[in-house]
Amino acid sequence: MKSGFAAILGRPSTGKSTLLNSICGHKISIISPIPQTTRNKIKGIFTDDRGQIIFIDTPGFHLSKKKFNIAMMKNIHSSIGEVELILYIIDIQDKPGEEENKILEIIKNSKIKFLVLLNKVDLKNTKIKEITQFLKEKEIEDNNIIKISAEKKINTEELKNKIYENFSEGPLYYPQEYYTDQEINFRISEIIREKAIENLKEELPYSLYVDIDILENKKGSLFIRANIFVANESQKGIIVGKNGKEIKSIGERARITIAKIFETKCNLFLQVKLKKNWNKEDKLIKRLIN
């Protein structure tokens, strides 16, 4: 029986969360075309007769001096210190850039075993030649490279085999039926945030967060009251929408997803609140990103 921890690293929107959800077979990490949707270290657990893999999905690696981004980068570095293996995922639709150089530098300095995953091989018009040349120049051995499609589950079985090859004998860290260790409040707040991101302009998702005010199980149904906080007054109108159209859409789609995941009826009530410049408050950022 083998077991261990594997961190998923990569630039924003490379398919890290999709890979986590695909292999674990459940919606664990929220997904959006908006870069850096993932803020926290999200654990996904895969168990079979060979052992157990605990994946840690990390925020997208992005070089920026904004407080929020710096906090997320600290998250990535702390994740690396917790694992036996790093899965570095590259979107083959994009040319290698400054982030690729920095990520490989961090990985090599860590002395931790790693695999490079070339994701989205099911798509056309890729930069596979440029990426292959880049990895060759960085002296990455072919044995450490796997071509995959996280969405289409291409070569994910080969990936699991490779991961187990890099793990040592060990116990199961979680019961077999577990697929994540996230608390229900966090999962629900992330689902609401995901649905808000799907509706809104690109710049707005970075200025909102969700807090669960009330979460109760009443006669077999979830009763949830949640607050969506924004950083300035104008953003409230964007989220609420004309005659409440946007917030109603966010709430309805979040309710459907919550009911499906937790296999129960769900009553969800959302309210939009202003917390001016919250994304510049160190204490709040630290609480939200962990």
Curated annotation (Swiss-Prot):
Main location, first listed in the record: cytoplasm
A family per Pfam: KH_2
Keyword rRNA-binding: yes
Chain intervals for the UniProt region annotation (G5): 148-150
Chain residue ranges for the region called G1: 10-17
Keyword hit for Phosphoprotein: no
UniProtKB keywords: Cell inner membrane, Cell membrane, Cytoplasm, GTP-binding, Membrane, Nucleotide-binding, Ribosome biogenesis, RNA-binding, rRNA-binding
Example of a GO biological process term: ribosomal small subunit assembly
InterPro entries: G_ERA_dom (IPR030388), GTP-bd (IPR006073), GTPase_Era-like (IPR005662), KH_dom-like_a/b (IPR015946), KH_dom_type_2 (IPR004044), KH_sf_prok-type (IPR009019), P-loop_NTPase (IPR027417), Small_GTP-bd (IPR005225)
Residues the entry annotates as binding GTP: 10-17, 57-61, 119-122
Domain Era-type G: 2-169
GO MF annotation list: GTP binding; GTPase activity; ribosomal small subunit binding; small ribosomal subunit rRNA binding
Ranges for region G4: 119-122
Purpose of the protein: An essential GTPase that binds both GDP and GTP, with rapid nucleotide exchange. Plays a role in 16S rRNA processing and 30S ribosomal subunit biogenesis and possibly also in cell cycle regulation and energy metabolism.
Protein name according to UniProt: GTPase Era
Organism this protein belongs to: Borrelia garinii subsp. bavariensis (strain ATCC BAA-2496 / DSM 23469 / PBi)
